[in-house]
Amino acid sequence: MKEEKVTKNILDWLESNGWKIICYDFPQSGTGVLLHLNNDKRTEKNKGGIIPDIIAVKNDIGIFFENKDRFYKSDFDKLNEIKTESNYSDSLVQLLNGLNVKAIYYGIGIPQLEKDIEKSKLHLEKIDFLISTNTEKEVIIHYDSDGIFSNA
């Protein structure tokens, strides 16, 4: 399953569960929003910028997705860095301005392939949620550290 299908399935699932989509992106879509490194971390204008695959909000919660077509450890590392070092906090605050978001959670969306799910589960300490999807558009929550999908 391609990253585009993973993202579209998750977008549909989020919207059907009351999440407001703020931005989304998948390969060749051209729809994403570039988040810049905070000024104190930036060396060049767009260097180090990232484009999240999905940012959505519900109530006072924001969620930040990185979606892939399979397991990539580097995405877990990237999300952990974004989460713990707040390197993109200025751009996120600006993007979510006026939405009363009190917390942002970071996670991964992947296809429902057992080998990739098992590899992903070895890195759960770096993310807040792990979600998979399949060709039937089902979405499975494998990990949700703070119950954001059941409580929001």
Predicted ranges, named:
Residues T7, K47-I50, Y88:
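Amphipathic coiled-coil/heptad-repeat helices and related helical stalk/stem segments
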Residues I22-I61:
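Active-site metal-binding core of divalent-cation-utilizing nuclease and nuclease-like domains
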Residues T31-N38, I117-E118, I140-Y143:
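Short, solvent-exposed polar/charged micro-motifs at secondary-structure junctions
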